Regions:
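Mature catalytic domains of secreted/periplasmic carbohydrate-active enzymes
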Residues: 16-419, 426-447
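Bacterial Sec-dependent N-terminal signal peptides
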Residues: 1-17
């Protein structure tokens, strides 16, 4: 790290102005930045199976990942730089990766380990071993085994709506009671309320996992995060961490307010999820299918997704497939490892950096340097304060150039611009709702 000079011109506003601030748990989640979402379901073993063809579910004996190794999963996640991992414990088929007591369609009746295994327990143990925070996805809205889609039981199924809701409550109770504290809980498609015929999830999460971050969780939970409106790893720009209640649930339909609002009443930041493969691949790239390695995103494409997710004030959640052996495929391990190395190469070591309070920060470089990107970070413990900003560069000849501009900064903004040789950079907060507190203003030398 190179020493640099800081100049601060204070803005005319109160430092203690009223702004929405995250709690300590939400701050910890923002610091995590990178997670993985691990997928394995019955389709991995029976590719022609469509869980919406009710009554056609494969026999549970078809599920047999004979080489399953959750340590391999977490070792790979570590190479990416992931701080947390979310296991899809039950996806659309209804097949459950733990020996649930709620119904018979689970590992308890599979060929794998003679029905005595528990993938959720193995996953939690591996997370602890590798220092990765664990999370669980359990889809409350879809269950092909019980003829349910979007939270509503279809005609001809084995259970009533009331019985299905009891299954949901029992399974969530098992997952939230038997495996310790969870860092994140994933509600795919949001949560139907009891008024919408759904199970009463809010009291359960408040009682059993009050500290968990909840993706698209029930309104009333303290630690909500929201969908960004796509599964491409591209957060909207701007993407404020404060949002209205309408943006934190029901990802099934197109919803308004995906950008959030700087004056919204809830701290509810975005999480950008995407797969390692193009969405034209099997199950949108979320599930493994033999022969689709060529559909993986290139390293350049993945780096762009990092910059449009983490670099736009959201966390990045990479979808990772588990194959029919129970392993992350070799080709995927290589690409994920390369992705992590590229993130660290591009953003692990700054050329210069500083921090400070006020509407104008100056970053002096030790010598004329060709730069092409900066990282900006607010101290979000004091809320998001900057509304608009621009970046200036001073060339060796003394010319001042406007390099880029933007709206929100939040936890992290990565701003790229055409390479330019500069001796100093100036960050100017053009508008703000309280005195800006910049915890990190970092410049990076052009690598190419």
């Amino acid at each position: 790290l190179v020493a640099c000079t800081l100049t601060i011109l204070a803005g005319s506003c109160r430092e203690d102005a009223e702004v929405i601030c995250p709690n300590a748990i939400q701050q910890e989640w923002a610091e995590a930045e990178i997670g993985v979402l691990l997928h394995m379901d019955m389709q991995v073993f029976v590719p022609d199976y469509n869980w919406r063809n009710y009554g056609s579910h494969p026999d549970p004996s078809a599920f047999n990942p004979a080489e399953l190794d959750t340590d391999q999963w977490m070792e790979t996640a570590s190479k990416l730089g992931a701080r947390y991992a979310v296991l899809v414990a039950k996806h659309g088929s209804g097949f459950s990766l733990w020996p649930t007591e709620a119904h018979d369609y689970s590992v308890r009746n599979s060929s794998w380990r003679d029905g005595k295994g528990d993938i959720v327990a193995d996953f939690i143990a591996s997370c602890k071993k590798y220092g990765i925070k664990p999370g669980i996805y359990a889809n409350t809205n879809a269950n092909g085994y019980l003829y349910t889609d979007r939270g509503r039981v279809r005609e001809g199924g084995p259970v009533s709506q009331v019985e299905y809701n009891a299954v949901v409550a029992k399974q969530l109770t098992e997952l939230w009671s038997n495996y310790g504290n969870l860092f994140e809980i994933w509600f795919d498609g949001g949560v139907l309320t009891p008024k919408e015929v759904g199970a009463d999830v809010l009291p359960l999460v408040k009682k059993l996992q009050p500290d968990a971050i909840a993706f698209q969780g029930p309104l009333g939970h303290d630690n909500l995060i929201r969908w960004v409106g796509n599964e491409q790893g591209t957060a909207p720009d701007p993407c404020w961490a404060t949002a209205d209640s309408t943006t934190n649930s029901d990802g099934v339909k197109i919803i308004e307010g995906l950008h959030g609002r700087p004056d919204a009443p809830f701290w509810c930041p975005g999480e950008s999820d995407f797969t390692l493969r193009y969405n034209t691949s099997f199950e949108g790239g979320w599930m493994w299918h033999e022969g689709q390695d060529s559909l993986m995103f290139s390293l350049d494409e993945l780096m762009e997704k990092y910059e449009t997710s983490v670099g736009r004030n959201t966390n990045m959640l990479l979808g990772v497939v588990i194959d029919n052996r129970g392993l992350i495929p070799d080709a995927d391990v290589r690409r994920i490892t390369e992705f992590g190395e590229a993130i660290r190469k591009n953003y692990g070591t700054t050329t210069v950096r500083t921090s400070g309070k006020g509407s104008n920060l100056t970053l002096k470089l030790p010598a004329p340097t060709l730069v092409d990107r900066v990282i900006l970070q607010e101290d979000i413990a004091k809320g998001e304060r900057v509304l608009t900003w621009h970046l200036e560069g001073v060339t060796p000849s003394g010319e001042t150039l406007t390099l880029c501009d933007g709206t929100n900064i939040g936890h992290k903004r990565i701003a790229r611009f055409d390479p330019v040789g500069v001796v100093s950079l100036h960050l100017v907060a053009d508008s703000y709702k309280a005195r800006p507190i910049i915890r990190n203003f970092a410049a990076f030398e052009c690598l190419n």
